[in-house]
Swiss-Prot record:
It is a peripheral membrane protein. The keyword Ribosomal protein does not apply. This is V-type proton ATPase subunit E. Expressed in the excretory cell and syncytial hypodermal cells (at protein level). Expressed in the intestine (at protein level). It comes from Caenorhabditis elegans. The lineage of its organism: Eukaryota, Metazoa, Ecdysozoa, Nematoda, Chromadorea. Pfam families: vATP-synt_E. Belongs to the V-ATPase E subunit family. GO terms for molecular function: proton-transporting ATPase activity, rotational mechanism.
Amino acid sequence: MGISDNDVQKQLRHMMAFIEQEANEKAEEIDAKAEEEFNIEKGRLVQQQRQKIMEFFEKKEKQVELQRKIQASNSLNAGRLRCLKAREDHIGAVLDEARSNLSRISGDAARYPAILKGLVMQGLLQLLEKEVVLRCREKDLRLVEQLLPECLDGLQKEWGSTTKVVLDKQNFLPSESAGGVELSARAGKIKVSSTLESRLELIANQIVPQVRTALFGPNPNRSFFD
């Protein structure tokens, strides 16, 4: 018995419905997979961007903290420098006052001859030369002439040799000098300053650390003195 057109049409419709259903299922499967991949990629991108944002803000926080530390360090250093400057200014004022009082020493007729003798002796003992040129203030010339024989005797006892001292009467020390002498030997190649000013500077360099301690107390960060 042959198949009627009606049956053929039914079979065709059935086959078409099956194909359409299968196609729809396949399309849904593709859509689902595509959506899943999209969500995975979206999640990855979101996480990546979140990580970048976190790293950005962490970097900014570190920069801000570093800047804060730098500013704090600068402020601390500036404070220390101001404190050190104030201390140095105070020490300088103490030494300036001592310098201004030097002129009073040479004006003390009772004390100055012994001091001047000591300065001459110190200079001669530093040089230990056979021939020495001595400069002094013009106002001290007569006193130096009086003291020199005794100084040379003392030098000979200490050194065991004699020294010829020539007084330079053409080039006196400045009148504003506080006092003392300058000595030279070997045509001026060797010079020794034995003035009150030079002795004060020498003493100042030696006692500045002690002056700092006396004025401001010991420095906990300092383990030695100059």
